[in-house]
């Protein structure tokens, strides 16, 4: 298929959605009566859900209403009336208004730095400064400014986080020097399944329907169980809480051959809410060498759909939701001798879907019940074809183990009961967690294996004085394959003075091997990888210290933080080269990481924000009990980002820079640990976005990887069982240009 046809195919979907959006906009965009428009005096942006009171001067009782998300409310008074407009964080406005009069009201901000609300690890939704855990929040505004289309693009320039690239297995995340197999990925509190080589492919997490992302670094095993030794990444999806009907469409193009489209519609009526969205992401592949048939970045096509229905009552909220993901990845093989007219091509199809039901109860006396049940399915199928490049005919290879389907099914049930009253000295949370995972496929020993993990947990929050909080917690686990230890943690928060907070925690962590690490058997012409039923479970100790200071003065806000950590993990599981080209999952007896992070941000309301960060992470390891871990080997990274919003033209300029220092790498080869490193490199992204038609349309453009960083020399460590040998590592596909178009239209009562 030609490049021009690909463009028409991808953008044709969006133009259909654009016509629907324009129809909605033309029907509801132009008011036919007098309206009051409430805007922020500094930002010149609408103030949504402001409280408006109309009261007749001569007679009549007060009438109350709320502005729409566009900051509008109809003026339907019959006589001259007093109008009062109020909203949290703004000075109350008073005036008089006549029948049929349209009025623009400028509210004066009284608070310039509103605190974010977080839910990860909390008894109930809390402001971020009240959380006993240090939480990093990546807002929807930041996602839009970076023009990130998936989780890999979003996290690669975060301080202290490292994103690694593999052509077939995708991208993986490292936190505090610990690999992605120790990072728990959640979507609205439910674990995502479908890891490859222990890591979750970040390219498979799209951001089209994401409200914000909450990241906690450090063990959260008491609350979230296995795979949470390094931390938790919780993806919070959007919900339409205001408009009767909302239609949106997005299209994204990147010059390397990326074409992404997404369309969604949501509605609210009385207490009922509906949402349905779907899209297609396409990447045509990229190779550093035009003469090579083997592509450095594999072509892929993704389809995804998600939807939900919710009922919100005075006490209870009930939500049914589901999502579907389908990816096709093509791994082109090398030309075969002797005529070099044929090749073996492999197609990897990944299908993942989840269905879930959530029930939340807000009870009297600040008590909360949350229940969730979910079923998730993951299937990855590999089909290999022998292709004749002269006739373009291909035939399925039916011999050996070159074809396979591996499946994982997961059943999850979770419930919590919490008491969280800020006026009380004692609060608590108790809950249960049920996880049952089944793996199937020819590469699984016996073609079917099942692991069950059943746990109960409790934590207590004690505030002896208003400035001091302690939160001990414990988790009791029964695992069908392993004798699990008692997992416990103690966290503390001390407000030393106003705006200066110290957080300290000690945590135990626990991770059981997954089905693939235990029972995988994968042998073909280029792979010889085996699971290990004798693996021991990982156990960890973690100490975290965080100091945060912030100061709000008028329109300016300044924040500084520092974070130190130490991790000691027994029996960390890695893929090791045990003999020749044979690889097996084994336990690395001792593994330690330590380091610190420094960060600062300064903003001047409403236009300017600057952030800078620095992280130092050290790693040490030993293969057996008698071998010392040796000295820590450290890596450094530095980040700098800034944005400026020009109010009148609604134009935003942003840049994102990261320096990644010399990074140590460890590999186990036949009971010996070999070390190496990846050379330092720099990346820089620049974006420019502008809103049109009262923010119904937004156009973004920019340059990604301005320094054209591609491959970086790697010394001392081979590429491993899933990639070809090389003395370099792929970082990015180079400098690219992008264009993004977003349309959103809303109808209100």
PLM regions with names:
Residues 342-362, 495, 501, 508-568, ...:
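Outer-membrane beta-barrel signature, preferentially recognizing the C-terminal barrel domain
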Residues 39-43, 50-57, 82-90, 100-144, ...:
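Short, acidic, small-residue-rich periplasmic hinge/interaction motif at the N-terminus
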Residues 283-304, 315-369, 375-409:
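Flexible loop and strand-edge segments within Gram-negative outer membrane beta-barrel domains
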Residues 101-106, 151-154, 171-174, 186, ...:
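N-terminal periplasmic accessory domains that precede
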Residues 74-76, 163, 190-217, 532:
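Short acidic/polar hinge/loop motifs at secondary-structure boundaries
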Residues 135, 152-194:
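Extracytoplasmic beta-strand/coil segments of soluble accessory domains associated
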Residues 286, 510-511, 610, 661-666, ...:
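C-terminal beta-signal and adjacent terminal beta-strands/loops
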Residues 465, 560, 564-568, 587-668, ...:
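Gram-negative outer-membrane beta-barrel transporters
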């Amino acid at each position: 298929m030609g490049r021009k046809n690909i463009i028409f195919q991808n953008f044709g979907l969006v133009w259909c959605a654009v016509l629907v959006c324009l129809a909605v906009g033309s029907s509801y965009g132009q008011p036919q009566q007098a309206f009051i428009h409430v805007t922020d005096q500094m930002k010149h942006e609408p103030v949504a859900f402001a409280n408006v009171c109309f009261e007749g001067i001569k007679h009549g009782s007060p009438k109350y209403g709320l502005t729409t998300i566009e900051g509008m409310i109809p003026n339907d008074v019959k006589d001259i009336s007093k109008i009062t407009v109020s909203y949290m964080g703004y000075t109350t406005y008073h005036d008089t208004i006549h029948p049929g009069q349209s009025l623009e009201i400028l509210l004066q901000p009284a608070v310039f730095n509103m605190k974010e609300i977080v839910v990860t690890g909390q008894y109930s939704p809390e402001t971020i400064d009240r959380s006993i855990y240090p939480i990093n929040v990546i807002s929807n505004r930041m996602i839009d400014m970076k023009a990130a289309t998936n989780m890999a693009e979003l996290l690669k320039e975060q301080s202290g986080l490292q994103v690694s690239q593999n052509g077939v297995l995708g991208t993986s995340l490292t936190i505090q020097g610990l690999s992605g197999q120790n990072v728990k990925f959640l979507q609205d509190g439910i674990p995502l399944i479908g890891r490859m080589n222990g890591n979750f492919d970040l390219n498979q997490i799209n951001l089209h329907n994401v409200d914000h992302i909450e990241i906690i670094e450090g063990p959260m095993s008491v609350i979230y169980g296995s795979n949470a030794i390094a931390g938790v990444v919780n993806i919070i999806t959007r919900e339409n809480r205001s408009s009767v009907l909302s239609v949106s469409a997005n299209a994204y193009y990147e010059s390397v051959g990326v074409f992404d489209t997404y369309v969604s519609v949501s509605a609210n009526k009385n207490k009922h809410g509906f949402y349905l969205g779907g899209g297609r992401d396409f990447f045509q592949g990229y190779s550093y060498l035009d003469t090579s048939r083997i592509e450095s970045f594999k072509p892929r096509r993704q389809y995804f759909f998600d939807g939900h229905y919710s009922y919100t009552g005075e006490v209870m909220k009930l939500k049914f939701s589901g999502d579907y993901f389908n990816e096709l990845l093509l791994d082109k093989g090398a030309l075969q001798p002797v005529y070099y007219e044929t090749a073996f091509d492999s197609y990897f199809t990944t299908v993942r879907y989840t269905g879930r039901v959530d029930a939340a109860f807000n009870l009297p006396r600040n008590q909360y019940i949350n229940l969730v049940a979910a079923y998730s399915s993951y299937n990855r199928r590999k089909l290999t074809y022998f292709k004749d490049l002269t006739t373009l005919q291909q035939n399925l290879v039916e011999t050996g183990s070159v074809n396979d389907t591996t499946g994982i099914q997961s059943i999850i049930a979770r419930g919590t009961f919490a008491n969280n009253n800020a006026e009380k000295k004692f609060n608590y949370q108790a809950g249960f967690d049920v996880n049952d995972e089944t793996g199937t496929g020819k590469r699984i020993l016996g073609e079917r294996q099942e692991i069950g993990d059943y746990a109960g947990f409790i934590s207590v929050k004690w505030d002896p004085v208003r400035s001091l909080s302690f939160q001990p917690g414990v988790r009791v686990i029964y695992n069908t394959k392993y004798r699990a230890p008692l997992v416990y943690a103690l966290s503390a928060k001390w407000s030393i003075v106003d705006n200066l907070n110290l957080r300290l925690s000690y945590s135990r962590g626990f991770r059981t091997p997954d089905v693939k690490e235990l029972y995988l058997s994968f042998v073909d012409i280029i792979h010889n990888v085996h699971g290990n039923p004798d693996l021991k479970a990982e156990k960890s100790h973690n100490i975290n210290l965080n100091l945060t200071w912030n100061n709000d003065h008028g329109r300016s806000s300044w924040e500084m933080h520092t974070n130190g950590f130490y991790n000691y993990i027994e029996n960390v599981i890695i893929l090791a080269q045990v003999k020749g080209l044979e690889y097996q999952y084994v336990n690395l007896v001792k593994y330690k990481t330590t380091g610190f992070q420094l960060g600062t941000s300064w903003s001047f309301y409403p236009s300017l924000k600057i952030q800078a960060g620095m992280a130092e992470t050290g790693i040490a390891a030993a293969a057996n009990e008698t071998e010392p871990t040796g000295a820590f080997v450290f890596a450094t990274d530095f980040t700098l980002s800034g944005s400026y919003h020009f109010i009148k033209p609604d134009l935003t300029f942003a840049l994102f820079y990261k320096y990644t220092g010399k990074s140590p790498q460890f590999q186990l080869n036949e009971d010996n640990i070999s070390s190496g490193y990846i050379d330092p490199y720099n990346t820089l992204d620049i974006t420019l976005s502008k809103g049109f038609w009262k923010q119904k349309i937004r156009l973004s453009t920019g340059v990604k990887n301005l320094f054209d960083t591609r491959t970086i020399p790697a010394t001392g460590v081979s590429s491993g069982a899933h990639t070809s040998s090389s003395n370099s590592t792929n970082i990015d596909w180079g400098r690219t240009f992008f264009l993004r178009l977003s349309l959103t239209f809303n109808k209100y009562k």
